[in-house]
Amino acid sequence: SLNTKNDFMRF
């Protein structure tokens, strides 16, 4: 996504 950190949180 636009934010990698946000992606990690999703996983």
Curated annotation (Swiss-Prot):
- Can you name a GO cellular component term? extracellular region
The UniProt entry lists the main location of this chain as secreted
- Modification sites for Phenylalanine amide: 11
Protein keywords: Amidation, Neuropeptide, Secreted
Q: Which residues form a coiled coil?
A: none
GO biological process assignments: neuropeptide signaling pathway
Give the domain of life.
Eukaryota
Similarity-based family: Belongs to the FARP (FMRFamide related peptide) family.
Instruction: List the protein's name.
Output: FMRFamide-11
